[in-house]
Amino acid sequence: MNALGRHILAEIYGCDSNILDNLELIEDIMVQSAIVTGAEIREVAFHKFNPQGVSGVVVISESHITIHTWPELGYAAVDVFTCGDDVNPWDACNYIAKMLRAQNMTATEVKRGVFEKPVKVVNY
């Protein structure tokens, strides 16, 4: 089986609540997670909720990296979806968990676009 991409769904617990509620820090961590994996950043959008929490996306040429935080619970939901073989989504997940000072992370990898035969994707 051949997959177009790998999608990591990460549950990150025991995080520093001050980091989880800081828009600038979360945005920086997410952008840096793309940089350390060698991904090409296309767009960045983040939002701070009232009274707490941050959500955001880093759109990368290889797909996306997203986060939704619950500071009151010390929890972050993170998705990292990468296409191709050049960027390892696990590197981004592990970097994010480390920077959030997480006590625990559980994650599942889903293969996306699974074909029985190899497919050729045109890159523009």
Swiss-Prot record:
Binds 1 pyruvoyl group covalently per subunit. Gene3D superfamilies: 3.30.160.750, S-adenosylmethionine decarboxylase domain. Its EC number is 4.1.1.50. The active site is at 63 (schiff-base intermediate with substrate), 68 (proton acceptor), 83 (proton donor). The record marks 62-63 as: Cleavage (non-hydrolytic). Keywords: Autocatalytic cleavage, Decarboxylase, Lyase, Polyamine biosynthesis, Pyruvate, S-adenosyl-L-methionine, Schiff base, Spermidine biosynthesis, Zymogen. This is S-adenosylmethionine decarboxylase proenzyme. Is synthesized initially as an inactive proenzyme. Formation of the active enzyme involves a self-maturation process in which the active site pyruvoyl group is generated from an internal serine residue via an autocatalytic post-translational modification. Two non-identical subunits are generated from the proenzyme in this reaction, and the pyruvate is formed at the N-terminus of the alpha chain, which is derived from the carboxyl end of the proenzyme. One of its GO terms (biological process) is spermidine biosynthetic process. PANTHER family: S-ADENOSYLMETHIONINE DECARBOXYLASE PROENZYME. Its cofactor is pyruvate. Belongs to the prokaryotic AdoMetDC family. Type 1 subfamily. Pathway: Amine and polyamine biosynthesis; S-adenosylmethioninamine biosynthesis; S-adenosylmethioninamine from S-adenosyl-L-methionine: step 1/1. GO terms for molecular function: adenosylmethionine decarboxylase activity. Catalyzes the decarboxylation of S-adenosylmethionine to S-adenosylmethioninamine (dcAdoMet), the propylamine donor required for the synthesis of the polyamines spermine and spermidine from the diamine putrescine. Heterotetramer of two alpha and two beta chains arranged as a dimer of alpha/beta heterodimers. It catalyses: S-adenosyl-L-methionine + H(+) = S-adenosyl 3-(methylsulfanyl)propylamine + CO2. GO terms for cellular component: cytosol. It comes from Thermoanaerobacter pseudethanolicus (strain ATCC 33223 / 39E). The keyword Lyase applies. The modification Pyruvic acid (Ser) is found at residue 63.
